[in-house]
Amino acid sequence: MTFSTEIKEAAQPIIEEIYNDGFIQDLLKGDLDAQAVRQYLRADASYLKEFTNLYALLIPKAPSMKDVKFLVEQIEFMLDGEVEAHEILADYINEPYEEIVKEKVWPPSGDHYIKHMYYHAYAHENAAYTIAAMAPCPYVYEVVAKMALDDQNLNRDSVTSKWFDFYSTEMRPLIEVFDNLLDELTANCTEQEKKDIKESFLQSTIHERNFFNMAYINEQWNFGGDKNA
């Protein structure tokens, strides 16, 4: 079993929890609350900006020029391509996407997730740590989307079904590159290093769950009441 396969199998129970949580289940049925959509889109817009910065940090550590080229292409996709999925959700609540994301948010769960990835980018020379922290993002979306497309409860009459259609295919090239890089970059790692890299992957999978839930509950910072706002 390859290392990338091992860590993805270990993450499956967490992904099952993500799928069964309120955000995905309501999205599946086409009745996700509009404020949850707004919170998700605003937080994800901030998240994706930082994700592109993390790609830039990976470029000097990339093993080959082919990998560098792919990372540059992914920066372009993050800036333009993934907006398509966001616009599907904006259409669902009948609000312009650009208007929704004018309001910037930085909720606790998004903050913790981003800092987790930046930590590994700066703390470890081996890019495997950072890739392991980033890889659950595309992987979770693909698995959840494919699960939804096989679910008889998927509301095909709702525009939200197109969100699942998008993520069922569009993440595949990135997942394959991340898998190959993880297998290559961990080939000579010690067992302890592999354990730490695996933990980075699993922690990010939990961060993915928290991120969806953050939108679902409209998570905010609580500094002790309105007087400290």
Swiss-Prot record:
Q: Give the molecular function GO annotations.
A: thiaminase activity
Known EC number: 3.5.99.2
Instruction: Kindly give the Pfam families that the UniProt entry links to this protein.
Output: TENA_THI-4
Output the GO biological process annotations, alphabetical, semicolon-separated: thiamine biosynthetic process; thiamine diphosphate biosynthetic process
What is the active site of this protein? Answer: 137 (nucleophile), 208 (proton donor)
Q: In which pathway does it act?
A: Cofactor biosynthesis; thiamine diphosphate biosynthesis
> What's the subunit arrangement here?
Homotetramer.
What family does the entry list?
Belongs to the TenA family.
Record protein name field: Aminopyrimidine aminohydrolase
What species was this sequence derived from?
Staphylococcus haemolyticus (strain JCSC1435)
